[in-house]
Amino acid sequence: MNRRSFISSGIALGAFAALSRLPIAFASSLGDARSEQAAPIKKVVKTDEEWKRILTPEQYNVTRQKGTEAPYTSPLNNIHEEGVFECVSCELALFSSRTKFESHTGWPSFWSPIAKQNVREEVDNSLGETRTEVLCARCDAHLGHVFNDGPKPTGLRYCMNGVAMKFVKKQKHS
C-alpha cells in the first residue's frame, strides 16, 4: 500500500466513523430535549381500548388505523425551533428539528430519523401503489411514509403525519 492509498483509506474510515455517529450526535446536542436513541428499544404493547383512552380520535385513526391527516393542517409544519419530535403514543424520540425541511407537501418532512433503530419500515401496498411505511419501533404507531425524493445528504423524505408526533423544545441553559 502506498502513502496516497494509506491516507485516502484513513480519511474514508474517519468520515464513515463520523457519519455513523451523526444521529447520536444530533440527539446528544439537543440538551434537555428527550432522546432515547442510544437505549435498547423496549416494546410498548396496549389493547385498542387502552390506545383509545390515551389518544384523541384523530391520533388513534392515524397511528393505530394507518390513516392520514389532511395536508397543511398540522401545527408541526410551522415549528422551526431546536428540539425533538417524539411519537405521540409512546414518546420515543423520532426526528431532530435539525433534519426537518420544507417539502411543500403539507406534512412535516425530515431527511433522516434521529436514530435508524427508532423507526421501522414496512412495504405498504395500499392505494394501488407500493410505498414504504414508517412506524414507531417501540409501539408500532403508523407515522407516515418515506420516499426517495428528499434533499442531501440522504436523498430521503420522511413524510410524517404531524398528529402522530409531538414536539419537545430544547431547553436553554442559563
Question: What does each of the following model-derived ranges do?
Answer:
Residues 22-62, 70:
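C-terminal segment of N-terminal export signals and the immediately downstream linker at the start
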Residues 87, 136-139:
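Short cysteine-rich clusters marking metal-coordination/redox-active sites
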Residues 96-97, 145-146, 168:
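Short, non-ligating residues that shape and space the ligands of small metal-coordination modules
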Residues 84, 133, 156:
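Residues immediately within or flanking Cys/His clusters that coordinate Zn2+
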Residues 64-80:
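N-terminal post-signal-peptidase region of extra-cytosolic proteins
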Residues 78-109:
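Mid-length scaffold segments of soluble, non-membrane domains
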Residues 1-15:
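N-terminal secretory signal peptides and thylakoid transit peptides that target proteins
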Residues 91, 140, 160-163:
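Cys/His-coordinated zinc-binding microdomains
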